[in-house]
């Protein structure tokens, strides 16, 4: 019951706290192309995460589940939207259902709505190999997300305080998983060092989960008597984290998430090196405040606007979008310079 109540609290506070932190994409400028040699009607948006082929570089990221009928209804609606637009979708952490079988329905609903969809199971880094297998089977998942949420746990009144052995547990899951494993942050970004460690144990796909989206430190602080306010602005901005990711030179697929709200955000994230982008809080807010049809319409507009931007840049495919010239400036440039990461190759390609 405590876990289910926490799930509902997360939805309430995520909607009320909003997305107040910057994601850094304002520091990224495309180099205008006066002769793009492109046609809007022939632009294609297919992409891949590792060996998973996706029809769109937009997917619905992990949000909820395990909070009774309310979270079941949210996942049901999100699965409908995913089916309508042929988008991949992740569920929220399934540990609630592994602890309490009665909560499994709030996750299994997605397969009932969209039997042929691409879905990602989701567990925290405390999960065992056996729990990972059960989570994948629960939703007949095409991939498994393992989320890293140290700051959220530290801020959570009842959260974990011991993070030893995480990399070793992830390695065991990767070695034993029958589906691809995606390791993701939850709004605090990832450093190049973290990504190199993950690559060293066989992880091939990473969701950088940058600062700029739902602020889970702020969400958990709303649930505390004594706030740990110093965590509210903690983390690496999304744009910065994508560039840190690409600087590792590992054979990794990258998902950009963390405050992604517009087609321009999507285009910039992909041009920086992401293979795809993920939306969570922005989609949830539209769904809860304006309804499912409004969310369906918003995704239509996102795809149309992305194609407009790709046409302007002369990028006929997502792969070509990953190589258009752009300039990194401002605080993002300063951070990366201090970190020893050269960004000039972006502007000269």
From Swiss-Prot:
The lineage of its organism: Bacteria, Bacillati, Bacillota, Bacilli, Bacillales. Its cofactor is FMN; NADPH; Mg(2+). Its main location: cytoplasm. Its EC number is 5.3.3.2. One of its GO terms (molecular function) is isopentenyl-diphosphate delta-isomerase activity. Substrate binds at residues 6-7, 152. It comes from the Bacteria. It catalyses: isopentenyl diphosphate = dimethylallyl diphosphate. This is Isopentenyl-diphosphate delta-isomerase. It is found in: Cytoplasm. Keywords: Cytoplasm, Flavoprotein, FMN, Isomerase, Isoprene biosynthesis, Magnesium, Metal-binding, NADP. The keyword Cytoplasm applies. Belongs to the IPP isomerase type 2 family. CDD domains: IDI-2_FMN. One of its GO terms (cellular component) is cytoplasm. The keyword NADP applies. The gene is fni. It is an enzyme of class 5 (isomerase). FMN binds at residues 62-64, 93, 122, 184, 214, 258-259, 280-281. Mg(2+) binds at residue 153. InterPro entries: Aldolase_TIM, FMN-dep_DH, IPdP_isomerase. Involved in the biosynthesis of isoprenoids. Catalyzes the 1,3-allylic rearrangement of the homoallylic substrate isopentenyl (IPP) to its allylic isomer, dimethylallyl diphosphate (DMAPP). Homooctamer. Dimer of tetramers. GO terms for biological process: isoprenoid biosynthetic process.
């Amino acid at each position: 019951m405590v876990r289910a109540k926490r799930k509902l609290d997360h939805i309430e506070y995520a909607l009320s706290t909003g997305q107040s932190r910057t994601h850094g994409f304002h520091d990224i400028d495309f180099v205008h192309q006066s002769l793009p040699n492109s046609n809007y009607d022939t632009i294609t948006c297919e992409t891949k995460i590792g060996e998973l082929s996706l029809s769109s570089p937009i997917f619905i990221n992990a949000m909820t589940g395990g909070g009774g009928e309310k979270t079941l209804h949210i996942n049901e609606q999100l699965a409908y939207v995913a089916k309508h637009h042929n988008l991949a979708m992740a569920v929220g952490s399934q540990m609630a259902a592994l602890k309490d079988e009665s909560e499994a329905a709030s996750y299994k609903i997605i397969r009932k709505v969209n039997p042929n969809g691409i879905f990602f199971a989701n567990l925290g880094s405390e999960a065992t190999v056996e729990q990972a297998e059960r989570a994948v089977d629960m939703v007949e998942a095409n991939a498994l997300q393992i989320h890293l949420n140290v700051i959220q746990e530290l801020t959570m009144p009842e959260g974990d305080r011991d993070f030893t052995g995480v990399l070793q547990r992830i390695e065991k899951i990767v070695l034993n998983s029958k589906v691809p494993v995606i390791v993701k942050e939850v709004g605090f970004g990832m450093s190049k060092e973290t990504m190199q460690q993950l690559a060293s144990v066989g992880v091939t796909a990473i969701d950088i989960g940058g600062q700029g989206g739902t602020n889970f430190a702020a969400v958990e602080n709303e649930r505390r008597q004594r706030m740990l306010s110093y965590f509210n602005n903690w983390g690496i901005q999304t744009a910065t984290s994508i560039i840190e990711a690409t600087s590792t030179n590992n054979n990794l697929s990258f998902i950009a998430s963390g405050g992604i709200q517009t087609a321009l955000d999507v285009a910039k994230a992909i041009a920086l090196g992401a293979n795809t982008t993920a939306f969570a809080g922005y989609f949830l807010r539209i769904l809860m405040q304006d309804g499912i049809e409004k969310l369906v319409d918003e995704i239509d507009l996102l795809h149309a606007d992305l194609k407009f931007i790709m046409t302007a840049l002369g990028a006929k495919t997502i792969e070509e979008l990953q190589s258009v010239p752009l300039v990194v400036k401002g605080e993002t440039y300063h951070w990366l310079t201090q970190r020893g990461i050269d960004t000039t190759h972006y502007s000269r390609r």
